[in-house]
Amino acid sequence: SSDLRFAYNLLEVCYYSVSDKKITLDIVKSINNTPNIFHDKDGDNYYDLLSAFQKSIRGSDVQASLYYLARLLEGGELEAICRRLQVIVYEDIGLANSSMGPKVVSACIAAREVGMPEATIILGTIIIEMALSPKSNSGESAIYNAINTVKNNGSYPVPSHIKKNNPAYKYPHNYKNSIVKQEYLPKELKGSKFYIPRENTFENKLKIIMENLEKINK
């Protein structure tokens, strides 16, 4: 029932609002008197907030990102926030700022360890950096390009020279710069490109590396 969900949400907010995790009647009364912070996890509003949160970060709107973070924090959604942030950093920031991945994971670990209210500072700080970071979804696009190829074409045979214990395999570390001309894709997919770099500083460097490697294998 809605009453049961409300009680559960209230208890969850109380739990994350006290550092020693000791919930008293006074704490429950205090949190319960805070207006308009709860949302029904089974209703549209909960998922609308999570959607708005991610889209604000993706859209590089730092003010909106902080606002929706505050809404979710006040609703006791620490776990949901941390899960969503770890998706966002790889889905929407990705290779445009690859150092953000470990930063976000570390921030989420720290937020969970210290709990509320101190987690607010940790998450607020990392959200600002995420929102203002350059963005790229090339990693997401690349893996789904590969998945769609598998779904649409089935499984082609692995080239014999890279099968296990095949003497025809050329061990790259035995060659200059650990690079040797050798085909790795099935012959039916030769020349396929799943990863298409976006225009940003880091991926421009990756593009040059990739193009140089492709020249070697021509």
Spans of features found by a protein language model:
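Active-site flanking loop/helix segments enriched in acidic
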Residues: 35-41, 45-57
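Conserved C-terminal helix/linker of AAA+ ATPases
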Residues: 16-39, 80-85, 142-147, 160
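C-terminal helical "lid" of AAA+/P-loop NTPase domains
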Residues: 5-19, 27-33, 51-55, 66-71, ...
